[in-house]
Design a protein with these regions (language model features):
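Anion-binding alpha/beta catalytic cores of soluble intermediary-metabolism enzymes, centered on
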Residues: 18-29, 47, 52-54, 62-145
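Short, function-defining helix-loop hinge/capping sites that tune catalysis or transport
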Residues: 36-39, 92
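Short, Lys/Arg-enriched N-terminal segments with co-localized hydrophobic residues
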Residues: 3-17
Length: 145
């Protein structure tokens, strides 16, 4: 497709304004700082393109354990299910110093991740991967995928 054709398609496309309701889980550690900045980015995109983002904060992870005694409440799951998307920060803390890791496994911060993935029908945690040519024969990934 040529640049001119792409330009004309963009010009002829109807402008669609998006309204998105987000559950926001700031999480632990650096999570609150990163998610706060991500929300600023979304708000800037919204201002520029006429989109609206509405946020409702819910607790998950260590901050939820501190506030409620569990890594993710059923009420928080219900809020997440009612939204269009979930904006999620980091969950958990330093395993050697955080008091959360003295708790039984089902009450640790990561149990909230497992619960929300199950409740929302999510199954993958995708992360980018770099494969160096020198190591391609040692990698279990297939080149054709």
């Amino acid at each position: 497709m040529t640049r001119v054709k792409i330009y004309h398609e963009r010009q002829n496309r109807k402008e669609t304004k998006m309204q998105c309701n987000l559950a926001v889980i700031k999480g632990d550690g650096i999570g609150p700082e990163v998610v706060t900045e991500a929300m600023k980015v979304l708000d800037t995109v919204g201002e520029k393109f006429g989109h609206t983002f509405d946020y409702e904060q819910i607790l998950m992870g260590g901050c939820s354990i501190d506030a409620t005694g569990v890594p993710l409440t059923d009420e928080a799951v219900a809020v997440a299910k009612s939204k269009d998307a979930v904006l999620l920060g980091s969950i958990g803390g330093n395993t050697s110093t955080s008091p959360w890791y003295k708790l039984p496994p089902n009450l640790r911060p990561e149990a909230g991740l497992l619960k929300i993935r199950k409740e929302l029908g999510l199954f993958a945690n995708l992360r980018p991967a770099n494969l160096y040519d020198e190591l391609k024969e040692a990698c279990p990934l297939k080149a054709e995928i």
